[in-house]
Amino acid sequence: MVAPVNGIASALQQMQAMAAQAAGGASPATSLAGSGAASAGSFASAMKASLDKISGDQQKALGEAHAFEIGAQNVSLNDVMVDMQKANIGFQFGLQVRNKLVSAYNEIMQMSV
């Protein structure tokens, strides 16, 4: 039972690190002094890194599934299923982030100046 808890803790730690990276990884006092372009660049790079990781996880899962289908001896069904679920969770997370960004954009566009 320790392995699933470690997996959840690891996923939570990764999400917190991504949130810190998206926030610029700086304290509020230093982020106020920074320029808007630097914040936009760090957000864009964090978003690209997240999308690349999601894509990589999906490619890895598909590769393992294909290897299992052709009968590779070093790939078990458990590994395939776990990697497929990790890829699915990552995709769902990315989809929710996208939905929140679109919602925030629409809300900003509807604000009166």
Curated annotation (Swiss-Prot):
GO terms for biological process: bacterial-type flagellum-dependent cell motility. It comes from Burkholderia mallei (strain ATCC 23344). One of its GO terms (molecular function) is structural molecule activity. This is Flagellar hook-basal body complex protein FliE. GO terms for cellular component: bacterial-type flagellum basal body. Pfam families: FliE. Keywords: Bacterial flagellum. Belongs to the FliE family. It is found in: Bacterial flagellum basal body. The keyword DNA damage does not apply.
